[in-house]
UniProtKB/Swiss-Prot annotation:
Its cofactor is Mg(2+); Mn(2+). The lineage of its organism: Bacteria, Pseudomonadati, Pseudomonadota, Gammaproteobacteria, Vibrionales. Mg(2+) 3 binds at Q828, E840. One of its GO terms (cellular component) is cytoplasm. Mn(2+) 2 binds at E299, N301. This is Carbamoyl phosphate synthase large chain. CDD domains: MGS_CPS_II. Keywords: Amino-acid biosynthesis, Arginine biosynthesis, ATP-binding, Ligase, Magnesium, Manganese, Metal-binding, Nucleotide-binding, Pyrimidine biosynthesis, Repeat. Signal peptide: none annotated. Mn(2+) 4 binds at E840, N842. Its EC number is 6.3.4.16, 6.3.5.5. PANTHER family: CARBAMOYL-PHOSPHATE SYNTHASE [AMMONIA], MITOCHONDRIAL (PTHR11405:SF53), CARBAMOYLTRANSFERASE FAMILY MEMBER (PTHR11405). Residues 404-553 are annotated as: Oligomerization domain. GO terms for biological process: 'de novo' UMP biosynthetic process; glutamine metabolic process; L-arginine biosynthetic process. It comes from Vibrio vulnificus (strain YJ016).
Amino acid sequence: MPKRTDIQSILILGAGPIVIGQACEFDYSGAQACKALREEGYRVILVNSNPATIMTDPDMADATYIEPIQWEVVRKIIEKERPDAVLPTMGGQTALNCALALEKHGVLAEFGVEMIGATADAIDKAEDRSRFDKAMKSIGLECPRADTAKTMEEAYKVLDMVGFPCIIRPSFTMGGTGGGIAYNKEEFEEICRRGLDLSPTNELLIDESLIGWKEYEMEVVRDKADNCIIVCSIENFDPMGIHTGDSITVAPAQTLTDKEYQLMRNASLAVLREIGVETGGSNVQFGINPKDGRMVIIEMNPRVSRSSALASKATGFPIAKIAAKLAVGFTLDELQNDITGGATPASFEPTIDYVVTKIPRFNFEKFAGANDRLTTQMKSVGEVMAIGRNQQESLHKALRGLEVGATGFDEMVDLDSPDALTKIRHELKEAGAERIWYIADAFRAGMSVDGVFNLTNIDRWFLVQIEEIVKLEEQVKAGGFAGLTQDVLRQMKRKGFSDARLSKLLGVAESEIRRLRDQFDIHPVYKRVDTCAAEFSSDTAYMYSSYDDECEANPTDKEKIMVLGGGPNRIGQGIEFDYCCVHASLALREDGYETIMVNCNPETVSTDYDTSDRLYFEPVTLEDVLAIARVEKPKGVIVQYGGQTPLKLARALEAAGVPIIGTSPDAIDRAEDRERFQQAVDRLGLLQPENATVTTMEQAVEKSREIGFPLVVRPSYVLGGRAMEIVYDEQDLRRYFNEAVSVSNESPVLLDRFLDDAIEVDIDAICDGERVVIGGIMEHIEQAGVHSGDSACSLPAYTLSQEIQDKMREQVEKLAFELGVRGLMNTQFAVKDNEVYLIEVNPRAARTVPFVSKATGAPLAKIAARVMAGQSLESQGFTKEIIPPYYSVKEVVLPFNKFPGVDPLLGPEMRSTGEVMGVGATFAEAYAKAELGCGNVYPEGGRALLSVREGDKQRVVDLASKLLKLGYKLDATHGTAVILGEAGINPRLVNKVHEGRPHILDRIKNNEYTYIVNTAAGRQAIEDSKVLRRGALAEKVNYTTTLNAAFATCMSHTADAKASVTSVQELHAQVQASLKA
């Protein structure tokens, strides 16, 4: 059946901001769907609130709405655009839930919009736990013993049936939010209450524990003629009990017998037929009891998922693209497989002759007090994928691609310490983020494969692979450097050992190992991911390295530019950097260069096989990048776009003769190295907060007496504010040195005078050596002291005077010329008492670039990439700053609900995972839209609680009167109440927790408040008020931890976020019109 002609326009629902459990894999699927549907001539309308996505670029869809993904707002878009159909399977749980709400509220019926890709009934049948259970029984498949509960009473009835331990999962949530494993009554009570609260339908599924069972996933695609293919089987290295998003996974499945595989394959197809998925991709999860082979079905997702992004990258089969085409009526046999250049149809199941390993990336160090053990609730923030010819090579490459400082199976424990074995046993039994390294330590300590299996339930086949790696390491150590013969070295490289790991084992420099490989002529060759195990020739240059015989890279002799990606997502380095890498590649491709992408993150658009001319799916480490450069010989390499990951390699690459284009590694160092930067600033006569660099605690104390408190303290060279703190007194400073950092001559600590209450400003600019053009000036809403990545911001500025802005423009220009920037530069300022202080300069792409590009319509990353390749700004027609005739506000999304026990106070350490954007004619409207996009819905009126720090007491009176005007009743804690009383406002007095009951927490728990403003400064005050913020979070009360955000919230009450919708294309037309005027 060819495509449908009865529909002309299709609305695609995006996934919104990046949160734990729902990351940039949906930008990848959404961007593919837009491309696929426009290719077929449909008009595509897209809604997604996340500006840091490729899919919201103005040329990806015909009409793009960066608006909150909420049914009332989407109804406005449907009313305006009148699409014929809506495709809800590309935007994760957010899109599914929104589509179901549109259906439930009659919006689809009202405007005659058809749901394609999945029916409301199929979504409901897969997501509603009790319906799913019945459906599985009807086709003879077993589910875990389970039942649903809507109250605590019902929950206890289910418990009687399943017993302890049991697994609790809320319905219609994502990434296991709110779920957990209960081993006793107390835990059961706590998890159930939390789950009932977090499920949109207030429903839980409680099932028998399958902890220790093996877990598998099948990625299935089905069309309406009932053709089904399995794209990929995935096996979880970690057994059941750990969320599959937090598990190490391997594809294809390694430990299934052929008979088991066929059983599972048939079961997956039966599931899709029964649920009624007619068009597109689904993922089906199974559990197998290793003791008796009993197989149960755990769940299925009737949409494109995190696993489908992984399966697409693992096989080269573009699931989202195919799913989008199936949704408009095509069948699999009518679609061509791009990778084999159309030699095979999409109805051929991919076959792969390599092993793929995915390892999740965690960020527990950012959440002091978080429970860092892995359970059924997802906690990882990103992932890395690696491809190898065998399991050991694949595993090794994934470990070094993670960028957690590992070069392979590095030792975690000092085996001579008395409690080494106790520590190892604990880490094996109670899995944390680092269990795989502890497994290697267990073998080093003499544990047997069975001993490790009994503690972990990880299949013995995987354990034997790790045991062998440990044995090989012992042999290398015993043989010493002289024992590295050509044969030994080649064998080690085939097993995936990195030069860095071998150098560690032998105690020589990494360059020594590289020299030896050159001498023996041992270099990696590149194999192609071709979907067909090399049975047909592949047109697509999608490569991975191995130490095999035949190289399939076949490089061309065109002019090439290589872009280094950012590796796995993590807090502080996320999708924004991938967005820049993709833009660099697209722009340079348009200009006729051959572009080469190097990256190892399976969720992203940059690792899509048709984003660049050639894709190398490899870890972004010095060894791997040098090997690719040796084969490809690029004219230039871009290191400034992937965040800190490629930037760290700049000097070493340059030293090895790799040509870095754009800002030179030396200039990058001048901005990053404190002392060299200081010299540049002094030469230009710019103002900086007083600061000092220290290498001992004594020095720090001495300097602090000169500079004065409060101080911002941090280690040098860091992204996302790791281990950064504001200290208020000497005792605090000493504690920081004892607890937070190891300070030394190699790693000094920086002290800066903290400008309390200053307004922070971010400026992105491009310099081509002749001129500097400002991309945008963003005024932060949270005051200085909150990490810029965690602060909301407005473009244009909403309170700063023209005079101050001009002062900053002038300084940016001077700095760009002084540092010799070629390409993008990000500068941060703080404004206090009409003085402009320079905080820092980053001569690279910053995380604000996508937001500025969407707000102004100027594609900064593309323009700057062309500058790096030698074009001037003038030749590109970008010569002056664009100030849009509307306001854009970026707001961040924080993951605190996943980490009970962590203080949600914003500070200098970055902890947000994603962002949304709101646009409006006024600042108030833009801010209101951004808040709605984050899901912060502020009720009209109610009761507000004010409890503020000393420094905020002057301004709190103004805030209180604004809240009264908006119809709020006021409560305040003692200090704040006294100030308000003096101003003639008499709030109700509430007790702090240690002042007797009923206290603040009691009132929060009784749902007395609709809004809480709490600011705190100083170690003790922050500690004392932590229970207040945790309470607000737990009871879902809106709260702000800065006064500026509270004032912005008051302003936003005057605007209606749902009143109007405007597409990006219309906004950019307004910009163009204002430029002509």
